[in-house]
Design a protein with these regions (language model features):
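Radical SAM enzyme [4Fe-4S]-AdoMet core and its adjacent flexible, acidic
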Residues: 30-40, 51-60, 65, 111, ...
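Iron-sulfur (Fe-S) cluster-binding segments and ferredoxin-like electron-carrier domains
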Residues: 26-32, 58-59, 288-294, 333-371
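Short hydrophobic/aromatic beta-strand element in the GNAT-like acyltransferase core
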Residues: 10, 272, 327
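Short cysteine clusters
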Residues: 17, 21-24, 264, 279, ...
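Short Fe-S-cluster ligation motifs
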Residues: 69-88, 313, 355-403
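C-terminal accessory region of radical SAM enzymes
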Residues: 225-257, 286-332, 336-337, 347, ...
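Processing junctions and N-termini across compartments
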Residues: 11, 15-18, 42, 321-324, ...
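Conserved alpha-helical substructure of the radical SAM core
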Residues: 1-136
Length: 403
């Protein structure tokens, strides 16, 4: 079928990261080792070496794309119609060639955004990226409170992030902040918004955890209660009104509390594409781990234009012809596109099913059962599993579980 021109490319240039966030959307099978919050160092001692960059389900044995390969991908994306590129990971600053990739994006006339934890982004690197043409930075924070933030990240990172935010502003680069919201930090939403004001962010995303990758593994610990979600929504709405014209605030609800599915990335293969560290091209960043039965083409063997227009993986759920009932007869089908394919796969083991978040899905009971379990256990302390990294030096030594 015919395809729209893509609007944005997410360039996951590495899955290496100095942090260990338990809600990371990266694949969980890069390493088989696990580490609980009660002993985060145990997992680090068995963390994967830097070369272990291919997940168990991958169809190739390649390592990360080279500088030259990424530069070619960027040129092909621009030729395909892409207007914006996000450099993500993992932690994209783990790649020393990041300024070269940003420069390639500028030469291709793409708007570039760095999605980062900020670790490693000192004043020298900030200015190098600015001079290469970087347009904006999205800086992640785990909380406004340093102790809580460092426990969530599994690393001493919060104080460094504050310095990074100041460096970004001083360099004249547009700054947005991203707070990933979950049960352990959602009650500090007012303080997070206050921190964004202090740091001078122009945009703030208050994003409830979406349950893929490590977040799916830790769902029972991370999913907030309905009372927490409703209270947070009211706080975010009030802040959006109060700060109108100064800070753009976006509050992203957790899917499970919705009754209709989100139009995930404006539909499968419609406007967005992701290239992961080893060169697989995905309709969304979680597709290869959530739907392993699909074969995803690689930029080392096919050009981006062919993959976007012709590949089986991009066409499998593009449009509406693939839809089962009740989606096929739904008047919303060209608005929500049946919801999220990865969520359908994770919850029902069939990516072609209606997203079970939808109130009309025959599988909505799965989501309702998850919510019942969350509310029945909301007063109990749980440990989570930290994300394990392909390369994971860290000085974090806390051994206390979060209550």
């Amino acid at each position: 079928m015919s395809a729209h021109r893509p609007y944005a490319l997410l360039a996951e240039i590495t899955h290496r990261c100095p942090l260990h966030c338990p809600y990371c959307s990266n694949p969980t099978d890069y390493c088989r080792a696990t580490a609980s919050v009660a002993d985060p160092e145990a997992g680090r001692r068995s963390a994967c070496p830097t070369t272990a960059l291919t997940p168990a389900h991958a169809k190739t044995n390649y390592g990360e794309l080279s500088t030259e390969e990424w530069q070619r991908v960027i040129r092909e994306a621009a030729a395909l119609g892409v207007l914006q590129i996000g450099f993500s990971g993992g932690e994209p600053l783990a790649r020393r060639d990041l300024p070269e990739l940003v420069r390639a994006a500028r030469e291709a006339k793409l708007y570039s955004n760095l999605i980062t934890s900020g670790i490693g982004l000192d004043d020298t690197r900030v200015r190098a990226l600015r001079d290469a043409g970087l347009d904006s930075v999205q800086l992640s924070f785990q909380s406004d409170d340093a102790d809580l933030a460092d426990k969530i990240a599994g690393a001493h990172a919060h104080e460094r992030k504050l310095d990074v935010a100041a460096n970004i502003r001083a360099a004249g680069i547009a700054l947005s902040l991203n707070f990933v919201i979950h049960r352990r930090n959602i009650d500090r939403l007012p303080q997070m918004i206050e921190l964004a004001e202090v740091l001078g962010a122009g945009r703030v995303e208050l994003a409830n955890v979406q349950f893929y990758g490590w977040a799916f593994l830790n769902r029972a610990v991370l999913l907030p209660t309905r009372e927490q979600v409703d209270r947070a929504r009211n706080i975010a709405t009030a802040a959006k009104t109060r700060l109108a014209g100064m800070i753009d605030i976006f509050y992203v609800l957790p899917d499970y509390y919705e009754t209709r599915p989100k139009p995930c990335l404006s539909g499968w293969g419609q406007r967005y594409l992701t290239v992961n560290p080893i060169g697989d091209v995905l309709p969304c960043s979680t597709a290869s781990s959530a739907i392993p039965e699909l074969r995803f083409e690689n930029v080392r063997t096919r050009d981006l234009d062919w993959i976007w227009r012709e590949s089986e993986s991009f066409n499998r759920f593009r449009g509406t012809q693939w839809m089962p009932e009740p989606c096929r007869s739904c008047p919303q089908k060209e608005i929500d596109f049946g919801g999220c394919r990865c969520q359908a796969a994770l919850l029902t083991e069939n990516a072609a099913n209606t997203d079970p978040v939808c109130e009309f899905s025959p599988n909505r009971a799965i989501v309702d059962e998850v919510l019942r379990n969350v509310h029945s256990s909301r007063n109990h302390a749980h440990d989570w599993t930290y994300r394990i990294n392909p390369s994971a030096p860290s000085s974090f030594e806390s051994s206390r579980a979060l209550a």
